[in-house]
Amino acid sequence: MNEYRSSLVFATPDVPLRDDVRRLGALVGDLLAEQVSADFLEEIERIRTTAIARRESDTPPAGLLSLLEGREPRAAEALVRAFSTYFQVVNIAERVHRIRRRRDYQRSGTDTPQPEGLHDALRRLKAQGVTLDELSEWLPRIDVEPVFTAHPTEAVRRALLEKEQLMVASLVDNLDGMRTPNERATDAARFRMALTASWQTADSSPVRPTVEDEREHVGFYLTQVLYRVIPVMYETLEHAIEETYGSTLALPRLLRFGTWVGGDMDGNPNVDAHTIAGTLDAQRRAVLDRYLNELWQLASLLSQSTTLVAVSPALSAQLERYQALLPDAAARSRPRHGDMPYRLLNDLMRARLQATLDDADGAYAAPAELEHDLQLILDSLQANKGLHAGWFAVRRLLWRVRSFGFHLARLDVRQESSVHARAVADALGQADWDSQDATHRAGLLGPYASGEQALPQVDDEGNARLDAVFAALADARTRHGADALGSYIISMAHNRADVLTVLALARRGGLVDDAGAVPLDIVPLFETVDDLRGGTGTVQDLLADPVYRQHLRARGDTQMVMLGYSDSGKDGGIAASRWGLQRAQVELLEAAAELGVRLTFFHGRGGSIVRGGGKTTRALDAAPRGSVDGRLRVTEQGEVIHRKYGIRALALRSLEQMTGAVLLSSLRPRAPEPREDAWRPVMDLVAERSTVAYRGFVGAPDFMQYFRLATPIDVIERMTLGSRPSRRLGQDAALSNLRAIPWVFAWSQARAVIPGWYGVGSGLQAAVEAGHEDSLREMAQDWPFFRTFLDDIAMVLSKGDLNIAELFSRLAGPLHARFFPRIRDELALTKHWVKTLLGQRSLLQHDPRLALSIRLRNPYIDPISVLQVDLLQRWRATDGEDEELLRALVACVNGVAQGVQNTG
């Protein structure tokens, strides 16, 4: 599998990637010949050659279909897995190449810092007049918080991810130019071993993962990857500051992490008070175990003897205090360590950590106490010639404690507004609660939200579940500390009453502090086009409400609002979603500023462009002026977690990019663009007409039947990808009730990617017909928001394939003739205007590296897609009862997901 079309040209820096892909492709061929047969490999080559020829001629996939249709399920599954294995090694090669390129930049010196890194950000800031003093004033305000979620978009098993890490490690080791031939042979053997083990491991689990499984999955990235790179991130920033300004700064904590795993109740009956408590306990154990292990390793390093070197009086005093506090632990210290005060203190610190883990006497009351002990050691080492005798290792642990505390990651809780509304309606005995005016409901809720009256207790399941949740949060605050808890997010928030409802329920559940306030940050999530449009009014009403304003004063007069990228796109199309999000941020910031409240945004981004994915650096550059202000809180979902944080070097790069982008956007936001006043009405028109086209398509009669026939949504619903159902429980199959993730996933699998572009062409055409073509060209050239929007659409279009999409569409029978021509026409219109406004002859002309990456994969995705159509038709003929066909279809879904590198 190592032939390539001559039209694939690699730039000079990427030639090593080409060599890796060829070498690993040949290795995949060897694997297939060994594990299946030489005849099987020859058949794969015939299919691959046909797919490449089809791509080069841009013809319908009839030849591929004749080669692939009618195969036995097991034979079809083997074919899919063969092509999927190729994607696997290409993805690995590209990730390792990113590490290679990073090292190339580092070797070249700081005269050419890697773009979007910390060195690059600081150089740009200095060039724009930022002084060291200004940087020092801003750093304490920087707060970057990736929040990991367990949405069912990760289509790769944990067992396979671990083997992939082994393959990555062998390739990274091979980057060392000093490796001997024997060592290189060993590296190749390690890669082959992990690759073969992957081939012999089923692609998907036979059972749906539990919340505990998802918690373990996310915990792997937190404890095994990010735990290790956090100190390196701070060391990199220190070095960048010194290189740029010639001086150093004492760095505050800039990064922390959040999670939804175990706390996201929205539509998931498996998440409740028990998973909240269990998650917090599990995370506490995980991070304290890491600290204990690291202290154990430090014990042998910190063996300084008082006969040779002194220690600080403060450290000696702390040692004496701990010996009195923990006499049993002190007695267990070995006599031969009696002249090693650092080691003796280390023994007692481990005893305190163990007591913290066991909830026993002598426990640390808070992470700050452990930080204090570590700082004592650092100060003593620095004062006594120990900078090169353990100081570096101790400081790395200190950075970890500052970043992860005793909780590892802050746990958010999320629930849909209607669940709260039903509970309050039952508690107040008002069956018509939903039909009452929102202002009237808010007035009724005021006394309960303020604590003047107690919300009645009701003996029903809904109220009992919510009471248990708030009781669990109150207990968690006492047991784990306030830092362990993130926000309480209200999905599908529509008005002020939705927020006051949560405040009233929290009081009833016992989540009240000693001052009588509810110690909870309540975050409305605006996720439909209408809610984004009305969000400013909702926040104005909320901040003007005396009860809520009193609550907010106790929270530091800071309000967070979450912006939903997924459902707004499903609701009104991508143009209306993007523009609605942009306008909402501007209007919300203005409203909050007028009322004296600091507003921060929580971006609910998904993995794909359709759901707000893409490069953080470009997203922040395109964000409204003043919307960052030192803070970035963003969800990291599904396959994004593995892509960004699966390898230590790439995790470090991701953290650097986010931190650098926040620094740039905060200290030197983009200069105001006076033409934006003229551009906004143009964008209003684009969004409005795009929405009309999009809703006209997805709202057409029989559309949902077409969707269910022309995509593999029925297969996706049967897959065991996550603990949450694909639609909200107890609701029908209408589009409004389908989750955004399977909606996008299904269209991506069908290669049409409708949510990522449909309606954009109509919107742009309408603006041109209204006489705005020159403005659109200016916007594409000079407005980062619009340029990023068009670039993202171009990327989505590049990953689609109209010929393959037509094969899927024909599965819908008579509905094909009604819907597919509309897809074809809108696609042509969208491609035309995107290329025209970007001034490009072909999509992604400005990003040849991304274009090459997509072209590398497409000929290998096509056979899987064609096979998927054939299998889907046969499986549906059995009414979905043939398990062998289903297993082959699941393999197809996994293969396409690996190929396009997007699920939902």
UniProtKB/Swiss-Prot annotation:
The membrane spanning regions, by residue number, are: none
For activity, the cofactor(s) needed are: Mg(2+)
Keyword Iron tagged: no
Q: What EC numbers are recorded for this enzyme?
A: 4.1.1.31
One cellular component term (GO) for this entry is: cytosol
| Biological processes, Gene Ontology terms | carbon fixation; oxaloacetate metabolic process; tricarboxylic acid cycle
Q: Active site at which residues?
A: 151, 570
Picking any one GO molecular function of the record gives: phosphoenolpyruvate carboxylase activity
The UniProt entry, under InterPro entries, shows: PEP_COase, PEP_COase_bac/pln-type, PEP_COase_Lys_AS, PEPCASE_His_AS, Pyrv/PenolPyrv_kinase-like_dom
Question: What's a Pfam family this protein contains?
Answer: PEPcase
Keyword ATP-binding in record? no
Q: Which UniProt keywords are listed?
A: Carbon dioxide fixation, Lyase, Magnesium
Q: Which reaction does it catalyse?
A: oxaloacetate + phosphate = phosphoenolpyruvate + hydrogencarbonate
What PANTHER family does the entry give?
PHOSPHOENOLPYRUVATE CARBOXYLASE
Stored NCBIfam families: PRK00009.1
Role, per record: Forms oxaloacetate, a four-carbon dicarboxylic acid source for the tricarboxylic acid cycle.
Q: Which family does it belong to?
A: Belongs to the PEPCase type 1 family.
Q: What is this protein called?
A: Phosphoenolpyruvate carboxylase
Upper classification of the source organism reads: Bacteria, Pseudomonadati, Pseudomonadota, Gammaproteobacteria, Lysobacterales
What gene codes for this chain? ppc
